[in-house]
Amino acid sequence: MFTVKVPATSANLGPGFDTLGLALQLYLELKVTIIPQSTRIRFFVDGEEYPEEIFGDNLVYQAMKKVFAEAAVVEAPGLELTINSSIPPGKGLGSSAAAIVAGLYAANEILEKRFTQEDLISWAVEMEGHADNVVPAVAGGLTTAMLYRGNVYYQQFTFPPELKLVVAVPDIQISTDESRQLLPKKIDFMDMVNNLQRASYLLASLIKHDFRYLPAAMDDVIFQPRRKQLIPGFDRVFSQALGNGAVGVALSGSGSSIIAFCQQEEKRVAEAMQDAFAASGIQSQLMILAADPDGVKVLR
């Protein structure tokens, strides 16, 4: 028996669309028990057993099947799979990436680590469609990733430990596909230049622990202005977070969660963000987290 533990992730961080990502201390755990002399798979989610006709669509299961197929395994061993996840789905916190990574790493563990981390990341990006959540889920910390000629390349950095992360999770569920439909087919040249400047400055500022201009560096001019129409109270939440002490704020992934970076006053910032959502008639949950430095772990 072993457990695969995968962190939630926050992608983009403002201007770093499909590029920047951050692992969070909020987890999906997949417990795997191998059943000798059996080929049956039993699947449990939060204590409830799923019938086969339902769990076949689960991303954990699909990811495991992907690895077994790549290894030319005709018949997988009997397994009992138990998922417990604290990552809310459809909230821009990398729930699908966590599920995919958990399944890939679980199957690879069963196969005695036959495949490399590069293999697993490549398949995860293939399944997810982009690297910004997958890479920090695997590597931990703050990451920047690129796809080039079919390959995934990334760098990982230590996120400043003095920054706490306030995540406001409104009672609004947004699919990534729905959110991406709002994105422009063409981008204004100067908007592209502005976002490129800000993403570069943001990454350098976090590496140097210089937070003076994070509000400017995280001010995305292309994607958040379009996606915010799905989130009532968006502008007020941003302004209240910054006005109460946050050093930076961004939409987390495709939303609906909003993440604020805080050196101090994180409880005050959290309450201000929740009050701002409430003023628009939206209930929200709050989490005060730290960055996860390690990424996926296999625990025995």
Swiss-Prot record:
It comes from the Bacteria. It catalyses: L-homoserine + ATP = O-phospho-L-homoserine + ADP + H(+). PROSITE patterns: GHMP_KINASES_ATP (PS00627). It is an enzyme of class 2 (transferase). SUPFAM superfamilies: GHMP Kinase, C-terminal domain (SSF55060), Ribosomal protein S5 domain 2-like (SSF54211). It is found in: Cytoplasm. Pathway: Amino-acid biosynthesis; L-threonine biosynthesis; L-threonine from L-aspartate: step 4/5. GO terms for cellular component: cytoplasm. It holds the Pfam family GHMP_kinases_N. GO terms for biological process: threonine biosynthetic process. Disulfide bonds: none annotated. The keyword ATP-binding applies. Its EC number is 2.7.1.39. One of its GO terms (molecular function) is ATP binding. The keyword Nucleotidyltransferase does not apply. ATP binds at residues 88-98. Keywords: Amino-acid biosynthesis, ATP-binding, Cytoplasm, Kinase, Nucleotide-binding, Threonine biosynthesis, Transferase. InterPro entries: GHMP_kinase_C_dom, GHMP_kinase_C_sf, GHMP_kinase_N_dom, GHMP_knse_ATP-bd_CS, Homoserine_kinase, Ribosomal_Su5_D2-typ_SF, Ribsml_uS5_D2-typ_fold_subgr. Its main location: cytoplasm. Catalyzes the ATP-dependent phosphorylation of L-homoserine to L-homoserine phosphate. Belongs to the GHMP kinase family. Homoserine kinase subfamily. This is Homoserine kinase. The gene is thrB.
